Design a protein with these regions (language model features):
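Well-ordered alpha-helical scaffold segments within catalytic/enzyme domains
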Residues: 214-223
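Extracellular/oxidizing-compartment recognition motifs
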Residues: 1-202, 210-211
Length: 223
């Protein structure tokens, strides 16, 4: 299961070994049929820029009053996370994302109905984990379903956005002003995931043209 709001659920026990190899002997494969009745028109190249992984961040584990297993990226991004998992068979790992802390604890109520999570059921074999059918808007990552992080290593976060070239930059003698400007740059990056969106994290994530119309003149000064 996977969608942009609720995230992804992956049961590794259902994997088909070598499913994309010519040598795969999976008995339930069915022959395809050529569609000669539907007129799909000519294939053309995409008009928008490709979405790429533009930054890779190594998060730091933080201590919360609730003793949660939380990592901090130090920057709010749109994208996904990756890690290595070497867990006992049958363990269901839950990974949740959030944008901020409340009372120094993990917080996600601002996401409203969006679950924004990743669930992984282990086969007992070491595996590389990366969501493939969703994306998240987040700064914090919370692990649950395990007592500690034994078997979970190499945690990284990938910032994804359209392959735009940054054309403008502002640097001042005031670090707070610099941070304010950088926040606006990251907000633009986070919401330029193919089409300009209103937000990358909660249960909306729509390409409203009204939002883009208002922001377009400002955006053109940066990218």
């Amino acid at each position: 299961f996977g969608n942009i709001y609720d995230g992804e659920r992956y049961d590794a026990n259902l994997e088909i070994e070598n499913w994309c190899a010519p040598s795969c002997t999976y008995a339930n494969w069915q022959p395809v049929k050529r569609n000669t009745t539907t007129n799909l028109g000519a294939i053309s190249a995409r008009l928008s820029l490709p979405v790429k992984a533009k930054h890779i961040i190594t998060p730091k584990q933080i201590t919360t009053p609730k003793n949660e297993l939380v990592f901090d990226l130090g920057q709010n991004i749109t994208g996904w996370f990756t890690f290595m998992a070497d867990l006992p068979a049958g363990v269901e790992l839950r990974v949740q994302t959030g944008e901020l802390l409340q009372d120094d604890c993990f917080y996600r109520d601002n996401l409203r109905t969006a679950l924004s999570e990743y669930r992984y059921i282990s086969t007992g074999k070491k595996a590389f984990i990366r969501p493939i059918a969703t994306f998240y808007g987040f700064r914090y990552i919370k692990f649950s379903g395990v007592a500690d992080l034994t078997g979970i290593t190499d945690i990284q976060a990938w910032a994804l956005y359209s392959d735009l070239e940054q054309t403008g930059e502002i640097t001042t003698a005031n670090e707070k002003v610099n941070r304010l400007y950088l926040n606006s740059v990251w907000s633009q990056r986070d919401n330029f995931l193919d089409v300009p969106t209103d937000c990358p994290q909660r249960d909306e994530r729509m390409g409203w043209t009204g939002d883009a119309h208002v922001f377009a003149p400002t955006a053109s000064f940066t990218m």
